[in-house]
Amino acid sequence: MSNKGQLLQEPFLNTLRREHVPVSIYLVNGIKLQGQIESFDQYVVLLRNTVTQMVFKHAISTIVPGRAVHFSTAEPADANSNNG
């Protein structure tokens, strides 16, 4: 995975994990999983509901938080935003 992707994924997933935000995870095959993110690494997300499921990131289409979340990448503004 590119470094740019990790700059967004890690703070987003960490916020969801730390704040115990309920999430819906949609897989590429259309299946919807629900629970709370327990942990994650470069390749998988551990999703806890009645049991803990290991979900491979390559199978994930979308992660939808159950409420609004605010997170920071702690990086300066994107260079592309200075196109004016």
From Swiss-Prot:
Cystine pairs: none
Record function comment: RNA chaperone that binds small regulatory RNA (sRNAs) and mRNAs to facilitate mRNA translational regulation in response to envelope stress, environmental stress and changes in metabolite concentrations. Also binds with high specificity to tRNAs.
The keyword Flavoprotein is annotated on this UniProt entry: no
Protein origin, superkingdom: Bacteria
Family in the record: Belongs to the Hfq family.
Name of the featured protein: RNA-binding protein Hfq
NCBIfam families: Hfq, PRK00395.1
InterPro entries in UniProt: Hfq, LSM_dom_sf, Sm
Entry's Gene Ontology molecular function annotations: RNA binding
Gene name linked to the record: hfq
GO CC, alphabetical: cytosol
Assembly mode: Homohexamer.
Pfam families given in the database record: Hfq
Protein's GO biological process: regulation of DNA-templated transcription; regulation of RNA stability; regulation of translation, ncRNA-mediated
Organism listed in the record: Verminephrobacter eiseniae (strain EF01-2)
Signal sequence, renumbered to the chain: none
The entry's keywords: RNA-binding, Stress response
Segments forming domain Sm: 10-69
